[in-house]
Amino acid sequence: MVTKDSIIRDLERENVGPEFGEFLNTLQTDLNSEKPPIEQVKSQLETHFNLAHETQEFSRKNDNAPVDKLLTNYYNNYEVNVLEFVLQMGFSRDLSIPLNVWFVLDMISQLSTSKQDLPLDYYLVLNNSQTGKYSDFVRYLIYEAVGAEIHCFEQGSMPEQYRSSRWEDKVKGPALANRGPIRGNVGAGDRKITFHLLCKKTARMILVGDDRETDFEMSDRSFVTLLLDYYQRVGTTKKIDLLLLTNNFDTNMNNKLQQLKILESLNMLKSNCYVLDYQITVDQVTANFNSYVEGIPAFRRHEIANFLKKRKTPKNADELIFKYVGRWNICYQKKFHQGNISIHQISGYLD
């Protein structure tokens, strides 16, 4: 774990403003206090950075809607009934780093109290190039607030880092210890980061994503290795809901289908399947261009649907799409159906 002094030195070197170092120097948490550490950190963040004023401005720009509702809608783009929660922080240019951190702590606090009977896993993804210099600052605050270290994987090394030992990380300290492991990664990528494979002992859903532009491609070998590792942990009788996301149906999807067929032949895949073809970019021009050049060829759609025809699309599939693309500006969207199979094709951009 990085130290407070090393973070302050790095912040000074990056010339990001003295208030961040000043905050770390004044931050105090008392484990004997009636107020949980997470609330202590939130309160000090709010005071030191005058977040009350910022939230008021944020509310004013959004028709005076309650800030807690706005923030929830803004960030909580993964909300399904599985034992897994992803807090994806696409740091907004409208919000400061401290307010983003405050909200993540608030979300962790809410999830922990509302799901007391569940072992929760948290994945924190910082997906904006502007936040790289603040990564250690964020990790340190979360460590102080919840007693768990957030792990940092450098851009391009994600597939190699997903090894079985990764799922054995334990919470350091008593905070939220009864909630189960709290793990996370702080990526060094930019706003084009999409989704990555998240699998663990308790989850009912596995997400597979590729984004070649940021070198976060999950290789076929890694994909199969992790699925096998997952089944070894939970047993082959456990039902999995598989949400398969890819941004390249023509080539990569074909490889994934081959691997799924292998797993199915081994009787290791007893899941519902849902397919989303996404093409997300950071500007409207590229997104509009992708609307024309990207597409799922008819023969590929038939192959996918034929492979998946015995599986049922999750009832909340459309809801999942809404959650995932809620912050995207959609330029093109098309939906294909064949039996119970639902294939979404989306092109858009992040503002």
From Swiss-Prot:
Subcellular location per the Swiss-Prot or TrEMBL entry: Cytoplasm
Entry's Gene Ontology BP terms: glycolytic process
Metabolic or biological pathway: Carbohydrate degradation; glycolysis; D-glyceraldehyde 3-phosphate and glycerone phosphate from D-glucose: step 3/4
Domain of life, per lineage: Eukaryota
Residue pairs linked by disulfide bridges in the UniProt entry: none
One term under GO cellular component: cytoplasm
Keywords: Cytoplasm, Glycolysis
Assembly information from the UniProt record: Heterododecamer of 4 alpha, 4 beta and 4 gamma chains. The gamma chain bridges the N-terminal halves of the alpha and beta subunits.
Function (record text): Structural subunit of pyrophosphate--fructose 6-phosphate 1-phosphotransferase. Not required for catalytic activity. Fine-tunes allosteric regulation of the ATP-PFK by ATP, fructose 2,6-bisphosphate and AMP.
Further facts: This subunit is only found in some Pichia species.
Name of this chain's protein: ATP-dependent 6-phosphofructokinase subunit gamma
Lineage of origin: Eukaryota, Fungi, Dikarya, Ascomycota, Saccharomycotina
